[in-house]
Each structure stands twice: as C-alpha cells, then as structure tokens.
C-alpha cells in the first residue's frame, strides 16, 4: 500500500483547504492550458449572449491539473451557482434527482469522477442532459407509476482521470470535451509565484522555478511542494526561499531534479534489476512493487511515460536509455527500446 507521497497528484485534506484560498476565480487568473482557456472563453461568452445554459462539458486528464478549479472558474464567469459532487457519492437515482431538482436556471452541476456513476444513475442522467427532464418512479409493485419532472436548463461538468471508462452514451451527451495537459516548468513557475504572493511567502523567482521544475507538470504538486519548502525555510532560512533553500528542501524531501521520488525510482530500478529492463507485464510489475495495478497506471506511469523514461509496448513496460542514465547506469546496447512498437495498456 502506497503511503501519501509528497509528489502524489491525488488531493489530500490539506490540499483541499489550501486550494480554496489560492484557487483562481476568473479565466484571466487561470494560468496555463491556453487552448482550453481560449475555447472556454468563447463558449462562455456565447452562452451569456444568448441567455442560455452553456452546453455540457467533459474535462479529462491526469489528477491535479485543475479540473475542479476550471469548473469553479466556469461557474464564476457564467455568474451562476456551482453544485459540487462526485460519482461515488451518487449511489441511487433518487440522490441524483434531489441534486437536479434543486438547481436554479443555468446553474452548473460538477460531478467529479463521473466515470464511477452506476448504470442506474446514468439512465436518469441521460434525459436530464438531453431534455432537461427526469422520470421518477412513484410507488411499488403493480401500483408503481412513472412521473416526468421538468428541470431548469443547467450545465453539467463531468471530470474524470479515466475517460476511457466512460460509457459511449454518456460521453456522447457532452457537447464540449476538454483535455487538460501537463504544465510546462514556465507555467508552473508563474503558478508558484502567484501562490506564494497570495500566501505571503517570501520566494524568489529562481526559488519558484526550482520548485516548479520538480512538480511533475502538476499545479497541485507545485503548490504542495511550495508549502513544504515554506516549512523548511521557516526553520532553516528565516522564511526566505531562494534557489539554494529550495534545493536543500527538495533533498530533504527526496524529490530529485526530475520530480521523481523513491517510488518512481524504485519502479524504474525494479524493471532494470528484476526484469532486465523489460518488457514486463503490469500485473507482474505491480506484484513486484507490492502496489495495485491502478496505482501504477493512474499515478506513477503517466509522468514517467510523458518524460520519456518508460514506454508501453505490445509485450509490456520497458525502461528507456534515459531511465538507465537517470539511475546512474549505462544503457545496454542490445536493450534499446523499440519505440516503433504499438502501445498497449495491458
């Protein structure tokens, strides 16, 4: 079982509390994701000009990139209320009906982890999204009857880290689909500088850049690292964060210049030492690391693959020469990964 990692992209209670104070309210303050921002600005302005509810939005991408934040920004820009829930919380059709019937015209309903909705709940959601109506069963047995309830026009924003698990009927009902990408170090530096200013942290630009480049392209991780470096600086550097202080704090946290922690390095080294660099199946790798398959696929692998340290081939996972060099090893000539091989999630 994985302990809470400093560079984990999943949200902690501390993250949720801190995010509330630094979360941008407007698109102008939402840094990065420029193509998404440009498109959403047009959709929002068009909906406001027509006086209509904006079309339903599906936002997907790795954890920590700002899906929830973007939903808040959209609601603020539209000038409407936002209701927040998640797929696992909506257990029964009645739970969803209660949420929908309490919405005001043009409100935004945000459902996180929407891929985890049950089939029964999804069936209620379809007519709600298409026709702004829901069918409710009243009574039991032979006396049961269905009544149709009209809903005010609303915008559903669904967020997921696993878009492939969405059913086709649900996915097809979203008129706007946006994918959030990992952030560049430059974009994350701007985010760290902004967060430091809001939180009253004394942080130099080079200190912010050092935090940003180790944040795995993820704002949530960047803000968490900023808080940990702030703790270090308060004890060791009179509260001042510069390049040297940031580097010393990262060394204490065991987060290397690539943004990898012990679990990342252990995964790469396990593939090298136990499986001769790969290929290795995900189940074998998960067993060797004593981790769940989902943890590898959703938490560890995406960034390693995106940075070119790991590839998925038809035969399994393989490390690249870049991974050997990062571990201080010489890449074997006969183990160069076959980049041209087709990818395989399994």
From Swiss-Prot:
Localization per Swiss-Prot or TrEMBL: Cytoplasm
GO BP: any one term: DNA recombination
Region (Head domain (RuvB-H)): 257-346
Region (Small ATPAse domain (RuvB-S)): 184-254
EC number: 3.6.4.-
Catalysis performed (reactions): ATP + H2O = ADP + phosphate + H(+)
GO cellular component terms, A-Z: cytoplasm; Holliday junction resolvase complex
Positions with a binding annotation for ATP: 22-23, 64, 67-69, 130-132, 173, 183, 220
Gene Ontology molecular functions: ATP binding; ATP hydrolysis activity; four-way junction DNA binding; four-way junction helicase activity
The keyword Transmembrane appears for this protein: no
Annotated InterPro entries: AAA+_ATPase (IPR003593), AAA_lid_4 (IPR041445), DNA_helicase_Holl-junc_RuvB (IPR004605), P-loop_NTPase (IPR027417), RuvB-like_N (IPR008824), RuvB_C (IPR008823), WH-like_DNA-bd_sf (IPR036388), WH_DNA-bd_sf (IPR036390)
Annotated spans, Disordered: 1-20
Any Pfam family hit: AAA_lid_4
Sequence positions that bind DNA: 293, 312, 317
Entry domain remark: Has 3 domains, the large (RuvB-L) and small ATPase (RuvB-S) domains and the C-terminal head (RuvB-H) domain. The head domain binds DNA, while the ATPase domains jointly bind ATP, ADP or are empty depending on the state of the subunit in the translocation cycle. During a single DNA translocation step the structure of each domain remains the same, but their relative positions change.
Quaternary structure (record): Homohexamer. Forms an RuvA(8)-RuvB(12)-Holliday junction (HJ) complex. HJ DNA is sandwiched between 2 RuvA tetramers; dsDNA enters through RuvA and exits via RuvB. An RuvB hexamer assembles on each DNA strand where it exits the tetramer. Each RuvB hexamer is contacted by two RuvA subunits (via domain III) on 2 adjacent RuvB subunits; this complex drives branch migration. In the full resolvosome a probable DNA-RuvA(4)-RuvB(12)-RuvC(2) complex forms which resolves the HJ.
Function of the protein: The RuvA-RuvB-RuvC complex processes Holliday junction (HJ) DNA during genetic recombination and DNA repair, while the RuvA-RuvB complex plays an important role in the rescue of blocked DNA replication forks via replication fork reversal (RFR). RuvA specifically binds to HJ cruciform DNA, conferring on it an open structure. The RuvB hexamer acts as an ATP-dependent pump, pulling dsDNA into and through the RuvAB complex. RuvB forms 2 homohexamers on either side of HJ DNA bound by 1 or 2 RuvA tetramers; 4 subunits per hexamer contact DNA at a time.
Name of the molecule in the record: Holliday junction branch migration complex subunit RuvB
Taxonomic path: Bacteria, Pseudomonadati, Pseudomonadota, Gammaproteobacteria, Lysobacterales
Gene: ruvB
């Amino acid at each position: 079982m994985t302990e809470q990692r400093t560079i984990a992209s999943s949200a902690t209670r501390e993250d949720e509390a801190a995010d509330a104070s630094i979360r941008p309210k407007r698109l102008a303050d939402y840094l990065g994701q420029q193509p998404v921002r440009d498109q959403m600005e047009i959709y929002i302005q068009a909906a406001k000009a027509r006086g209509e509810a904006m079309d339903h939005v599906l936002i997907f991408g790795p954890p920590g990139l700002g899906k929830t934040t973007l939903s808040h920004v959209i609601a603020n820009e539209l000038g409407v209320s936002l209701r927040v829930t998640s797929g696992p919380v909506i257990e029964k059709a009645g739970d969803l009906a209660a949420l929908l019937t309490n919405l005001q015209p043009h409100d935004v309903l945000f459902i996180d982890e929407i891929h985890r909705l049950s089939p029964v709940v999804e069936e209620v959601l379809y007519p709600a999204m298409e026709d702004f109506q829901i069918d409710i069963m009243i009574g039991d047995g032979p006396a049961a009857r269905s009544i149709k309830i009209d809903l005010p026009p609303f915008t559903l924003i669904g967020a997921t880290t696993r878009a492939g698990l969405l059913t086709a009927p649900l996915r097809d009902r979203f008129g706007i689909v946006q994918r959030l990408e990992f952030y560049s170090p430059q974009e994350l530096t701007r985010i760290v500088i902004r967060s430091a200013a809001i939180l009253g942290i004394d942080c130099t630009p080079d200190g912010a850049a050092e935090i940003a480049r180790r944040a795995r392209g993820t704002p949530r991780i960047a803000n968490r690292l900023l808080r940990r470096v702030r703790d270090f600086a308060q004890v060791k550097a009179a509260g001042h964060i510069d390049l040297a202080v940031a580097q010393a704090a990262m060394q204490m946290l065991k987060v290397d210049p690539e943004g990898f922690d012990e679990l990342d390095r252990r995964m790469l080294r396990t593939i090298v030492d136990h499986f001769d660099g790969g290929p290795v199946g995900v189940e074998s790798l998960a067993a060797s690391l004593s981790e769940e398959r989902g943890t590898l696929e959703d938490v560890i692998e995406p960034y390693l693959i995106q940075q070119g340290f790991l590839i998925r081939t038809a035969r399994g996972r393989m490390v690249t020469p870049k991974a050997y060099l990062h571990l201080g090893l010489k890449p074997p000539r006969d183990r160069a990964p076959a980049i041209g091989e087709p990818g395989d999630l399994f």
